[in-house]
UniProtKB/Swiss-Prot annotation, chains A, B:
Record note on disruption phenotype: No visible phenotype when grown in the absence of nicotinic acid.
Origin: domain of life: Bacteria
Molecular function in Gene Ontology: DNA binding; small molecule binding
Stated role: In the presence of nicotinic acid represses transcription of the nadBCA and nifS-nadR operons. Also binds to DNA upstream of the niaP gene, probably regulating it as well. May bind nicotinic acid.
Protein name: Transcription repressor NadR
Lineage: Bacteria, Bacillati, Bacillota, Bacilli, Bacillales
PANTHER family hit by this protein: TRANSCRIPTION REPRESSOR NIAR-RELATED
Keyword Metal-binding applies: no
InterPro entries per UniProt: 3H_dom_sf (IPR035922), 3H_domain (IPR004173), HTH_11 (IPR013196), NadR (IPR026043), WH-like_DNA-bd_sf (IPR036388), WH_DNA-bd_sf (IPR036390)
Record's keyword terms, sorted: DNA-binding, Repressor, Transcription, Transcription regulation
Any one Pfam family match given in the protein's UniProt record, by short name: 3H
Complex formation: Homodimer.
Length: 180, 180
């Protein structure tokens, strides 16, 4: 740690919040650690403290995002869908969805020990999809859906219901959507 | 599969919902599979379809639970807390909380690839805590908090704020609560 000024406690958390509010794209823990001149672990604890105060920060697969009311307002339509596919079709599935201008807010599976396990992946563009897939492949992380033989839920968000209808139709045609 | 009547599609889902609504305690996938005379995987898909219709079923660490309005009403107070401890203190932490009559609704950590990962463990008694810990040990599942060097969030629910205050005080005295 160089001798540059190290931001301390509450001031640091205020500054983190400011950076996140001003940023147009997600900020990773590493980027925030460098900016605040502290370790990545200190950032994880700081973000946890802010979340414990109900500050609307989410850790997405791309980094931390401040979800203010306006950002949430933009995504008025929301729908939960049930999907079934092998891990090799994850990228295809996500692309079918984002190509309709729809965001995949999360993926939910049933963990045999923990019960419902929800991951806030928050991918809405082809770039974010490929970044997410690359991260999975580079870290050898398992696809969560492998825990339940491919069955999983997604919460989809979009500016309107029509886009979600289109995404569901595309998934159905691809044999990915589980229908009643 | 014996030749007993196998419940089919939508009827089966209606029946699953009825069993869950009537049950005073969580029902496991295995129990529902036996009752409906189908495989466990069929039950996972059925529950996913019901969840996709916003039916308030959650998969907890103890099994499926139907969270009707009354059940949720009973738990009016809710608070997110930030905690830090090693995996060996998980049981102690959960006991400190449930001993105050407080329920641990979930555990949330930051997965390096998936972002926020939330597990609906839903433990509220010493019996449920020991069942959860036994399951982790018997399946060698890692504690989620091990992914973030012990830092994690819990959402606590209880009939009133006072019980949550007491639980937080106990956690603080044990050096588990991360404070501002």
């Amino acid at each position: 740690m160089t001798e540059e000024l190290k931001l301390m406690g509450a001031n640091r958390r205020d500054q983190l919040l400011l950076w996140l509010k001003e940023s147009k794209s997600p900020l990773t823990g590493g980027e925030l650690a460098k900016k605040a001149n502290v370790s990545r672990q200190v950032i994880v604890q700081d973000i946890s403290l802010l979340k414990a105060k109900n500050v609307p920060i989410i850790a997405t697969s791309q980094g931390y995002v401040y979800m203010d009311a306006a950002a949430q307002q933009h995504q008025q339509a929301e729908r939960i869908i049930a999907c079934l596919h092998g891990p090799e079709r994850t990228e295809e599935e996500l692309q079918l969805i984002v190509d309709e201008g729809v965001t995949v807010k999360d993926v939910k599976i049933e963990h045999p020990v923990y019960g419902d396990l929800t991951a806030a992946i928050q991918v809405g563009t082809r770039k974010e999809v490929s970044h997410f897939i690359k991260k999975i492949n580079s870290t050898n992380a398992a696809y969560l859906s492998q825990l339940t033989d491919g069955v999983h839920l997604h919460t989809l968000t979009a500016p309107d219901e029509h886009r979600i209808d289109q995404a569901c139709q595309a998934l159905e045609e691809a044999g990915i959507l589980i229908k009643d």
